[in-house]
């Protein structure tokens, strides 16, 4: 026995030599195993370092992506620019459109604003965005539900026009033969959107029936009428289920009366049989004129939407500094407005004109200036009229 290693006494010299070789080989293997362990340990350390580095890069990328989304929600153009510059988004219409279509963490109002811009890149992104929607075998209401949920329509007429034109082109491409032209699809789309508002807005008292909806859309199919069954299906779909319009944080009505365009005391001439002047606290904001009995009231006594209204100075023998809100080319219709009765009921206003008196000439001029800046023409009606006129002209040109 050597060094505590047992060795049988009856071994031949050859067997002893072989045993020595085995022992030496064993020692070499142990050294090799130790070396491999050390190399493996070094490799694992390197891998862990690489993983930590990759994790850090991923974390950094995610942070930059979140920052880019926030920038987009505040300023869409700058947000896209930030993402492109940081190589988080390719600067192609298709990739930008896919980013907006996925919409993760994006404000849908900001998406609508970006898609509505007139710059060359934005227009290309709009068409790429619309092409991501699959409208095949969907009726018009189903397609509009999908489209209008992917962003929030902006308020500017020209932006809405471009976006709805792109929608009409895509719908007709996916469903050839349903309409004779994209103009027909465009006009009917607006008619459906307005129907949704009329049927489901609690401030609209006069709810249109199927017959009126059908009559509204006569002659829009290149001068011909659309099948009544198609219109009935669209009408029933909207009546049974309104459009779901995206609502982003911070746009709720609790902020309506903060930072108004103008506010102050004015006299308003009543619309009843006995015309009396009543002092009211007026607030001008969001293209609406609200009036209250007291400045501390939380709910207005009346609301006058300024859509499609005009304003003019008038002389009144009873009160100085007067002006009127009126409907241009009015044919006996009442201004769309509502007021709260003493018993709490909300009823439609009873005014063909609203006559108002300011305390001074200067205040009258300021109110007129502010209201003129706020008065807006409803873009739906404006664009619808223009497109219907185009269909009518086209029909006349085709007649022998």
Swiss-Prot record:
Outcome of mutating residue 268 to R: Does not reduce ARL4D GTP-dependent interaction but inhibits targeting to the plasma membrane mediated by ARL4C, ARL4C and ARL4D
Keyword Cell membrane belongs to the record: yes
Compartmental location: Cell membrane; Cytoplasm; Cell projection; Cell projection, Growth cone
GO cellular component term of the entry, any: growth cone
Designated name of the protein: Cytohesin-2
Disulfide bond residue pairs: none
Gene Ontology biological-process entries: actin cytoskeleton organization; endocytosis; regulation of ARF protein signal transduction
CDD domains named in the record: PH_GRP1-like, Sec7
UniProt region (C-terminal autoinhibitory region), positions on chain: 387-395
Tissues where this protein is expressed: Widely expressed.
Binding residues annotated for a 1,2-diacyl-sn-glycero-3-phospho-(1D-myo-inositol-3,4,5-trisphosphate), in chain numbering: 268-276, 280, 291, 301, 339, 350-351
Record comment regarding domains: Binds via its PH domain to the inositol head group of phosphatidylinositol 3,4,5-trisphosphate. The PH domain is necessary and sufficient for plasma membrane relocalization. Autoinhibited by its C-terminal basic region.
Effect listed in the UniProt record for changing residue 336 to A: Reduces ARL4D GTP-dependent interaction and targeting to the plasma membrane mediated by ARL4C, ARL4C and ARL4D
Record-annotated SEC7 domain positions: 72-201
Gene name, Swiss-Prot/TrEMBL: CYTH2
Stored PANTHER family: CYTOHESIN-2, GUANYL-NUCLEOTIDE EXCHANGE FACTOR
Membrane topology value: Peripheral membrane protein
Pfam families: PH (PF00169), Sec7 (PF01369)
Main location: membrane
Coiled coil: 10-63
Role played: Acts as a guanine-nucleotide exchange factor (GEF). Promotes guanine-nucleotide exchange on ARF1, ARF3 and ARF6. Activates ARF factors through replacement of GDP with GTP. The cell membrane form, in association with ARL4 proteins, recruits ARF6 to the plasma membrane. Involved in neurite growth.
GO molecular function terms listed in the Swiss-Prot or TrEMBL record: guanyl-nucleotide exchange factor activity; inositol 1,4,5 trisphosphate binding; lipid binding
Domain PH: 259-376
